[in-house]
From Swiss-Prot:
Pfam families: Proton_antipo_C, Proton_antipo_M, Proton_antipo_N. InterPro entries: NADH_UbQ_OxRdtase_chlpt_su5_C, NADHpl_OxRdtase_5_subgr, ND/Mrp_TM, NU5C-like, Proton_antipo_N. GO terms for molecular function: NADH dehydrogenase (ubiquinone) activity; quinone binding. It is found in: Plastid, Chloroplast thylakoid membrane. The keyword NAD applies. This is NAD(P)H-quinone oxidoreductase subunit 5, chloroplastic. Its EC number is 7.1.1.-. The keyword Phosphoprotein does not apply. Its main location: plastid.
Amino acid sequence: MEQTYQYAWIIPFLPLPVPMLIGLGLFLFPTATKSLRRMWAFQSVLLLSIVMIFSMNLSIQQINSSSAYQYVWSWIINNDVSLEFGYLIDPLTSIMSILITTVGILVLIYSDNYMSHDHGYLRFFVYMSFFSTSMLGLVTSSNLIQIYIFWELVGICSYLLIGFWFTRPVAAKACQKAFVTNRVGDFGLLLGILGFYWITGSFEFRNLFQIFNNLISNNEVNFLFVTLCAVLLFAGAIAKSAQFPLHVWLPDAMEGPTPISALIHAATMVAAGIFLVARLLPLFIVIPHIMNFISLIGIITVFLGATLALAQKDIKRGLAYSTMSQLGYMMLALGMGSYRSALFHLITHAYSKALLFLGSGSVIHSMETLVGYCPKKSQNMVLMGGLTKHVPITKTSFLLGTLSLCGIPPLACFWSKDEILNDSWLYSPIFAIIAWSTAGLTAFYMCRIYLLTFEGHLNVHFQNYSGKKNTPFYSISLWGKEGSKISNKNFSLITLLKMKKDGRPSFFSNKVYKIDENVRNMIQPFLSIPHFGNTKTYSYPYESDNTMLFPILILVLFTLFVGFLGIPFNQDGVDLDILSKWLTPSINLLHKNSNNSIDWYEFCKDAVFSVSISSFGIFIAFFLYKPVYSSFQNLDLINSFVKMGPKRIFSDKIKKVIYDWSYNRGYIDAFYETFLTVGMRNLAKFAHFFDRRIIDGMPNGVGLMSFFVAEVIKSVGGGRISSYLFFYFSYVSIFLLIYYFLNF
C-alpha cells in the first residue's frame, strides 16, 4: 500500500504528454499529425483511463484503511521562509480524482464524434487534456501555493475552451467575461492565502490548521482580520463555483462546445470551488460567522439559480442555471457543516448533469440537420418538440437525468438532495423552507426543459411556438400564457425568422453558416449516419451514432446506481453506507453523535415530503407544457381554468413579472453593465485623458516651451557679433539694476 501512495505524484502528469506531443507534431510534422488526429483522441482516453484505474486503487485503500498520505519536497528553506511542494492523498482527493477521470473519459469519447467536423479538433483535445492535468493537480495539492497555481491553470483552460470558437464575437465576449469575473475571485483568493500565511507562517494544510487552531484557542489573533482573510479565500470559491454575486459568467460559458459544458459543469471548473471549501472546512469551522456566511451565499444561489432557469429558451443555458442552483445546495451543506452531504451531492450531481449536457449535445447535433450550425436555432427549445420518435435513446437518457435532478427515487440525486434538505431543518427553518421550495422549482423547470424538447410535435414544422397545429382549443405558449390568435391563416410566426430575397418566406436557408475554420459546416438537409447497425437517410432529426451514445448510456448507469454509494441504511448489522466509510473521519456539525445510519421507517417518513414537492412541480410543468391537443383534445378543460377576470388579469401580471425577472437574468447583468462596466470604462477613459494630457503634458509642455524660446533667441541673434554684445550688456545692466534695488 505504501508503494502505491509513493507513486501517486504521477496522477496529474499522466494526461500531459498528449498536448505536448500534439504541439511537437504540429511543429515538426503538421500534415501527418492532422491526418492521424483520431489517434490523439485514443491516446487522451488511454492516459486518462490509467489515471482512473490508479485513482480507484487508491480509493479502495482509502475505504479499507481510512488513512491519508502526504509527501512533500522542500524547495526553499531558510530561517524566514519555508516553501514545500508535494501531494496529499486523502478521501477528498480520491473522490475528486475518480470524478474527474470518469467524467473526463466519457466526455473525450463523446467529443471524438461531436467535434469530428471541426477544424480545431486537435486544439480541442490539447485543451481538454491540459484541463484534466490542471484539475488533477488541484485536487492532489498539499498546500495553498500549489492550490493557487493549479487554480489559475484551471481558469486559463476554461478561458480557452469557452472561447474555443473565438471567431464568433459572442464566444469571444463570453470567455472574456468568464476570465474577468474569475479574476475578482482569484485576487481575493490570493489575498486570503497571503493573509493566512502572515498569521500562521505556513502554506501546508496540516500545519496551517494546527497552528491556526492553537492561535484561536489561545485568543492570539485579531478576529476581524481573520474573518476578512476567510471571506477573501471564500471569494475564490464564489467565483469558480458560480455563486451569487459572481455567477454571471456561467450561462455565457455555454458558447463553448457542448462537451466542454458537460466537463465544466460536472467535474472540473465549478467543482473546484466546492473542493476548495471542503478542503479548507477545518479552517472555516473555527472562525465565528464565516460558516453562516457560506450557508447564506449557498441558499441565495439555490433560489436565484432556480428562478433564473424558469424562462430560459436555450437548452444549455437552462441547464447552466440548474448547475448554479445545485452548486448552491452543496455550498449550503458545507456552510451547515454537513460535509458528507455536500460531497455526496457533488458526486451524484456530476454524473446526472454530465448525462443531461451530453444528451442536450445529442439533441443539438440532430437539430443541426434542419437548421444548420446556428446556436440560436439549434439550441432553442422553442423550435424543438416531438423529438421522442426521432431520438428515442437520447430522450430516455435525458428523462432519467431530469428525474434524477428532480429528486425522484431511486435515481442518484434523490439520495443526496434529500439528505441536504433534511439537514436544513436542523440548521435553520427559514433556510429549510427556501431549500424545499426550490426543490419544487427544480422539478418544474427541469420537466419544462424535457417537455419543450421531446414532447409534442417538431415546432420548426408548425405555425407557432406553442407546439400545436391550428386547433380551436386554448393554447399554452412557451411561458404558459395565452397563445395569440392569428387571423391570417396563411401567415406563420415562424416565417419571421427567415425571409428569402425574393420575398417568399422560408425557414430553411441554403446559406452555410461557416465561421472561418473553427466551427462545423453542417447544414445538409439529408444525412446518412450509421448507428446501431442501421443505415438510413434522414430529413428529420436523427439519433446520434455509437460513439456519442455509448458515454450517454454509461452515464445512465451511473445515474441509476451511484446514489446507492451513500445510502445510510443499517439493517441486521449490514452497513451499506460506503461513502461514510470512505470519508472517515468526516466533519458533521449537525449530527455529532450520529453514526450516519437510519432505519427504513425514518428514511421513508423524511423522503415522502420531498418527493411530494418534486411531484407537484412536475405536475405543474405537465399541466402548462404538455401539448394541449394530445391531453385535452376532447375535454375543454384548460378553458375552465383560464377564463378572463380580475383574478386572471392579476395572475397574468404576476407571471409577467416572474418571466421578465427570469428571462432578464434577474437584472443582475444589467446592473453590472450599468454601474460597473460602464463606470470602469469611463474611469479608464478619464485615466487615459489624465495620463496623456496632464502627466505627459507637463514634461512635453516644458520641452515645447524651451523649443519656442530657443527659436525666438535664435531668430533674434542671427549670428552677428553686434547682437551678441547688445544682449550681453542688456543682461548685465538688468542684473546690476536688480542688485542695486535689492541692496538699496
